[in-house]
Amino acid sequence: MAPLLEVNDLSIGFGNGPSVVDGVSFALNAGETLALVGESGSGKTLSCRSVLRLLPDAAQMRGGSIRFNGAEGAVNLLSLPEKKMRAIRGDRISMIFQEPMRSLSPLHRLGDQVAEVLRLHRNMGRRAAKRAVLEQFEKVGFVDPMRAWKSYPFEMSGGMRQRAMIAMAMVAKPELLIADEPTTALDVTTQAQVLGLIRSLQAETGMGVILVTHDLGVVANMAQRVVVMNKGRVMERGDAQEVLGSPAHPYTAKLFAAAPMIPAVAAPAPASPKPAD
């Protein structure tokens, strides 16, 4: 069976400068978690945003292909017309971004923002969309889904906003989820809950997950395979436990020696929206 996603020889640059993503290749199977690991500026996020063609305006796609072998057939995402690409974003492929406050509108209630995904991609009416969103809110751990629906992002803590982003990414039941540093700025307990939530939703749906992180504890707990990046290039790839236990590349060994760890992933705990501290 073909991988769910195949990224081949991807190169991205800005202006006349050198490629900041240089010949990157990796593959992801359905139901699998692949971790992209590296320091800030290594090209992890750009590589992932290229899957959804959400690069900065000044970025140039210089080469490569991204093949998505989803349920509706295989496509090269880089050659699709923008109209067809819009139909894939947030539907068959979803992304959890690093900073929820930048991704959520401060002017609209959370429920309306998540329901918009279903109205856009599933052509649902307001009542059907609301039922589906409330169900998703319950799945991601909101004790009071209706309260979450009525809340504005600024009324929620960081952990609650991240749960909301997971709900938005998952409500259309994507085949592929990209999670870009999903636990950034969260306390250790909330980190474990968010990661446990992603893992439980993956077990339920069978989706593939690309997890962008610099935290080796996250890799050890979540990923089956790992790709290590530095300065836009792949340094090492392989089975996560093998690479963690015995890195082959000197850069990988150096990175791992300085990397932070977190406790094992806990089961997602129920939560309700509350004002941020």
Predicted stretch roles:
Residues 237-238, 246:
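ABC ATPase "signature
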Residues 65-87, 243:
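ABC ATPase NBD Q-loop/coupling interface
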Residues 219-221:
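A short, surface-exposed alpha-helical micro-motif characterized by mixed small hydrophobic
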Residues 69, 128-147, 256-257:
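Conserved ABC ATPase "signature" region
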